[in-house]
Amino acid sequence: MLVCATLLLSCEDDYHCGLTTTVHQDGSFTREYALRLDSAQLISGRVDNSKNMVQLSGPWKLTWTVKGDSTRHPLPMDKDTYQRLAELCRQTHTKVEDTVVVYAMRHFASAHDIAKATRLKVGTLTLTPNISFKKSYRFFCTTYQYKETYPVLSHRFAVPLSQYFTKDEMGYWFSGHPDLTSALSGMEADDVIQRLKAQYSKWIAANDFEITYQALLAAYSQAGPGALSKRQFKGLHDKLMASYIEECGEEAQMMNKAEWLRKQLHTDAYTRILNDDTLMRKVTEQESDFMALSMLKVDYQLFMPSSASQPALSTRLLGSRLFAGSATLSSSATVSHTWTYVFIILVLLAALIGLIIVRHRR
C-alpha cells in the first residue's frame, strides 16, 4: 500500500488535463482535450487509454504543439522532429512529453453524444458526466443553456463527511461556497481554515482505518497466533480508531499499518493479513482511488455562441469536490436576431412611407 501511494504521488501529471467545450449556434458541440502523452504515443500517433486518464474512442482529430507556440502539427510526430526536440530538452534538462501539448478534438451533434464520449479514468473509477442542453427560439433571440454535471462520490467512503463537517463547512472546504471567512479578520480566517484542515485530516484517517478494519474482520480467520477473539477485536474498534486518527492524520495512507497494529495490540498476529496483497486489495484500491481523485485537475473552459472569443466559463474542476457533492459546470447565453430588428424597422419605415403617401394624396 505504501508503494502504491508513492507511485501515485509521483505521477500527478497523469490526472491533469485541459478540457474546452464549444457550443455552436446550430446546437452542435466541439470538445477538445489538452493532453500530455509519452514519447511512444507521440511517435506512434496512437493514444493508449491504459496510460491516460482521458479515455478516447472514435474519430478524434489529434494535433500537437510546443508549449507557448500556437502552431499545431498533425500527430504522429515524425522521428526527426522528435529527435530535435529531445536534443533541445536534454540541454534544458526537461522531457519531450513535458514540452509538447497534444490536442484531441471532436465534433458532436448532441449533448447525449458528447456525454457518452466523455470518460475520465481516475484510479479504478470512470467518471462520466451528465450533460443537458436546451435551445429556446424566440422571435427576437435564441437562448442557449448548457449544463455538465459530474456526480458526487461520497458513497465511496466508509465514513461520511457529515461526521466531521457541517453542511456549510463541507461547501466551503471543497468548493469555496458559502464563504465562511468573508467577514473575518486574517487571524480569524486562519483559525477557521486550520480547524477545517484538521477535521479533513481526521476524516481521511477515519476512512482509512475503517476500510482496513473491515478487511481485517473479513479475513479474521487467517489471523496468526496471539490474535484476540473476534468479539474482543470488535470491542476495540472505537479505541483503535481514535488512536489511529490521532497518530496518523492526513498521512494515514502512508502508514505501516502492520507495525502500528503490532504496537497497539502487542502482537504480530495480524501482520499476515495486512501484508497480503490479495486480502487487502479492496483497501489498496480505495486508497488509490482517493489519492487519484485528490490529484484530479481539469482546466475547463466553456464557449457559448454569444462569447465566441472569450470563454463564458473558465474554472478548474478538482476531483476533491466530488467527495462532498456533485460538480456542475454551466452557462447560458442569449443571441439576438439582428434580422428581426431590421425587419421591424423596414416594416415601420414602409408604414411611415405609406402614411405619408396617403396624406399627400389627400
Set out the residue ranges of the language-model regions.
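Sec-dependent signal peptide recognition
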Residues: 1-2
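C-terminal motif of bacterial Sec signal peptides marking the signal peptidase cleavage site
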Residues: 7-10
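Start-of-domain marker
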Residues: 12-84
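General N-terminal targeting signals
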Residues: 34, 46-48, 317, 346-350
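Short, low-complexity, polar/charged sequence segments that are solvent-exposed and flexible
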Residues: 51-53, 123-126, 350
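Mature, soluble, non-transmembrane domains
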Residues: 62-346
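Juxtamembrane interface at the cytosolic side of transmembrane helices
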Residues: 350-362
